[in-house]
Regions:
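AMP-binding/adenylate-forming catalytic core of the ANL superfamily
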Residues: 76-166
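Phosphopantetheine-dependent thiolation modules in NRPS/PKS and related acyl-activating systems
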Residues: 185-195
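Ser/Thr-glycine-rich phosphate-binding loops at phosphate-binding pockets of nucleotides
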Residues: 27-31, 78, 102, 180-182
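AMP-binding/adenylate-forming core of the ANL superfamily
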Residues: 55-77, 81-83, 89
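Generic structural signal for well-ordered beta-strand positions
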Residues: 65, 91-93, 180, 186
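Gly/Ser/Thr-rich phosphate-binding loop
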Residues: 1-43
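AMP-binding/adenylate-forming catalytic domain of the ANL superfamily
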Residues: 160-184
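Beta-strand->loop->alpha-helix junctions that form or flank phosphate-binding loops
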Residues: 23-30, 48, 127-130
Length: 195
């Protein structure tokens, strides 16, 4: 089982070729443990299945609400945007606090990242930065050396797979991302180093 952070496209692709059963877990500090699993082998849909005696719903924001009586007597309200399939199944879309509002259009960075993931080998993320006209503009932040003109052009061709407002307006290269003690990318810390 894998958990602690969403499983990357590259890792999921590598796992799909191995003769083992692999699962991504969903959990958070408030739930103490994982409350749902998603098969990483043979399943094309990215659907989490809750564990026994756990049900889920979505609040008015579209965020996951967890009902797990053995863990908490109160529902646990998250900031995770989901597509609810049933009271026992959901698709994780991203974090509501990461949503980019660009020209009045709400963009989920994690959705854009999943589309671009098979075109990039280095670590990257999608972010919103202040823009006088749009409020926020979408940017692609890449770890490593600055891209060559040819690499940039190739990458921009892949942007065509995205919806118009999801397409990054700029590509920012940073030699090393800021990280948490556990190795997760600190998006805000990384962006702050650019300013």
């Amino acid at each position: 089982i894998l958990g602690g952070d969403p499983v990357s496209y590259m890792l999921e692709k590598d796992l799909s070729t191995l003769p083992v059963e692999a699962f991504e877990t969903y959990g958070m500090t408030e739930t103490i443990t994982h409350i749902a699993l998603r098969s990483l082998n043979g399943q094309t849909e990215k659907v989490f299945q809750t564990l026994p005696q756990v049900t889920v719903s979505a609040d008015a924001r579209g965020c996951l609400v967890i009902n797990a009586p053995r863990i908490s007597s109160e529902p646990i309200i998250t900031n995770d945007l989901v597509e609810l399939i049933s009271e026992n199944q959901f698709k994780w879309l991203g974090r509501i606090d990461s949503v980019i509002n660009s020209g009045g259009v709400k963009i989920i960075p994690e959705k854009v990242e999943s589309t671009l993931a098979n075109h990039l080998t280095q670590r990257f993320f999608i972010a919103g930065v202040p823009d006088a006209m749009l409020g926020q503009k979408v940017v692609l932040v890449i770890e490593g050396a600055e891209l060559t003109e040819k690499q940039t052009e190739s990458l921009k061709n892949n942007f065509q797979k995205l919806e118009k407002f999801e397409r990054p307006k700029d590509i920012i290269s940073i030699s090393k991302f800021s990280e948490t003690p556990t190795g997760k990318i600190q998006r805000s810390g990384t962006l702050a180093s650019v300013k």
